[in-house]
Curated annotation (Swiss-Prot):
Functional description taken from the UniProt entry: Located on the platform of the 30S subunit, it bridges several disparate RNA helices of the 16S rRNA. Forms part of the Shine-Dalgarno cleft in the 70S ribosome.
Subunit structure, as described in the record: Part of the 30S ribosomal subunit. Interacts with proteins S7 and S18. Binds to IF-3.
Name under which the protein is recorded: Small ribosomal subunit protein uS11
Originating gene: rpsK
UniProt keyword rRNA-binding, yes or no: yes
InterPro entries with a match to the protein in the record: Ribosomal_uS11, Ribosomal_uS11_bac-type, Ribosomal_uS11_CS, Ribosomal_uS11_sf
GO cellular component terms, A-Z: ribonucleoprotein complex; ribosome
Pfam families, per the entry: Ribosomal_S11
Organism for this UniProt entry: Nitratidesulfovibrio vulgaris (strain ATCC 29579 / DSM 644 / CCUG 34227 / NCIMB 8303 / VKM B-1760 / Hildenborough) (Desulfovibrio vulgaris)
């Protein structure tokens, strides 16, 4: 018996000219997410998703590649102007911002939204290398 053909719905491209780029740079990875102004995700990429594994995920080059990948997908959805939010202490912060700028976006603003505790949780113990 022949199985009926299943039609796959093609994901429609949203036309979002203005959006936000969220860069989360941790010590182990960098995640770049492009959203519309209301916070709905349009595209995202991370250093791990870009093919880097282990300690190479935390490098500035990996962050640059992730930002380029996410920016390309966002531009396909019509994004031209972005505001950048940066969170975290990682080494990929500046590299990701530079990659977004080089991708041809008009950067409206750059804001650091790294959460700072008012003496909340106890931090991890100091590393002895």
């Amino acid at each position: 018996m022949a199985r009926p053909k299943r039609t796959v719905k093609k994901r429609e491209k949203k036309n979002v000219p203005v959006g936000l780029a969220h860069i989360q740079a941790t010590f182990n990875n960098t995640i770049v997410t492009f959203t519309d102004t209301r916070g709905n995700t349009i595209s995202w990429a991370s250093a791990g998703q870009s093919g880097f594994k282990g300690s190479r995920k935390s490098t500035p080059f990996a962050a640059q590649m992730a930002a380029e990948q996410a920016a390309k997908k966002a531009q396909e959805n019509g994004m031209r102007t972005v505001g950048i939010y940066v969170k975290g202490p990682g080494s990929g912060r500046e590299a990701a911002m530079r990659a977004i700028n080089a991708a041809g976006f008009k950067v409206a603003f750059i804001r650091d939204i790294t959460p700072i505790p008012h003496n909340g949780c106890r931090p991890p113990k100091r590393r002895r290398v």
